[in-house]
């Protein structure tokens, strides 16, 4: 049996509901290694476990895959109520489509390059020592969480193109940033990053958030009455 670790981004929308990409929770749909293996071996890929690491939370959290959209690259996961951190921020979702337009400022948040980027933020000797002691993704990310080194990358850009099914933007991100929120000028989430082109920084794609809201509501989610103010303020400050 072959096992491969995969890293992506997701975000909390309230009551333990987490949004991400379908290809993050079903990585074999987009991964060449898994596709090659299943085509040559009589086997079926499956998700062994799905763990989340949030900033300011020292423990990993088990996610349960709930459902995915059939057409768009969006998936909903849930956190068991007993595992839900008391002060886990809720990211507010934009319901007004008029706020999305070509030229508007956007901010993306995520974990491009996964733990490799987190290690790169540390002194070289310290990072090398950590990597030698914690070989697997599980143990490495657990250590980084316990030492408060799990922090997303935030970058600013603009919407460069737009149609009914995708938002094209030029804020820099990378592999591992898939599933991350794309914020509009109001600080609300307007999309979910699903495709990243490293050779062309002006062509990262996001699924418009209304597709995700529909999927969330089908899964039983209800919109919070008052979104977390600190999440909005953080993004607004970065967009200035």
Question: Which ranges hold each PLM region?
Answer:
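N-terminal activation segment of mature serine protease catalytic domains
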Residues: 1-24, 65, 71-75, 87-89, ...
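Catalytic-histidine neighborhood of serine endopeptidases
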Residues: 7, 13-15, 19-69, 81, ...
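Conserved hydrophobic/aromatic beta-strand scaffold that supports enzyme active sites
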Residues: 19, 74-78, 154-158
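A structural micro-motif recognizing beta-strand termini
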Residues: 55-56, 77-85, 92-97, 170-173
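Flexible, gly/ser-rich surface segments that form the specificity/activation loops bordering the active-site cleft
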Residues: 67, 89-165, 173-174, 195-204
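Short, solvent-exposed secondary-structure boundary/capping segments
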Residues: 72-79, 165-172, 203
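C-terminal subregion of chymotrypsin/trypsin-like serine protease catalytic domains
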Residues: 149, 161, 183-240
């Amino acid at each position: 049996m072959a096992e491969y670790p995969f890293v992506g981004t997701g975000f909390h929308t309230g009551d333990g509901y987490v949004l991400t990409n379908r290809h993050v929770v079903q990585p074999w749909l987009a991964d060449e290694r898994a596709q090659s293996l299943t085509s040559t071996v009589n086997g079926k890929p499956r998700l062994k476990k799905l763990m989340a690491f949030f900033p300011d939370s020292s423990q990993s959290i088990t996610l349960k895959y709930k459902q995915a959209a059939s057409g768009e690259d969006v998936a909903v996961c849930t956190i068991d109520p007993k595992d839900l951190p008391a002060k886990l921020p809720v990211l507010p979702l934009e319901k007004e489509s008029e706020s999305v337009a070509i030229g508007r400022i956007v901010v993306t948040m995520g974990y491009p390059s996964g733990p490799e980027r987190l290690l790169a933020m540390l002194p070289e000797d310290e990072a090398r020592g950590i990597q030698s002691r914690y070989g697997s993704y599980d143990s490495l990310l657990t250590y980084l969480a316990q030492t408060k080194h799990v922090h997303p990358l935030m970058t600013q850009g603009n919407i460069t193109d737009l149609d009914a099914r995708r938002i094209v933007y030029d804020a820099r991100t990378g592999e591992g940033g898939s599933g991350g929120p794309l914020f509009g000028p109001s600080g609300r989430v307007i999309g979910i990053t699903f495709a990243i082109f490293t050779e062309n920084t002006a062509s990262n794609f996001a699924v418009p958030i209304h597709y995700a809201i529909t999927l969330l509501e089908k899964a039983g989610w209800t919109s919070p009455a008052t979104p977390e103010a600190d999440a909005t303020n953080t993004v607004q400050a970065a967009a200035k």
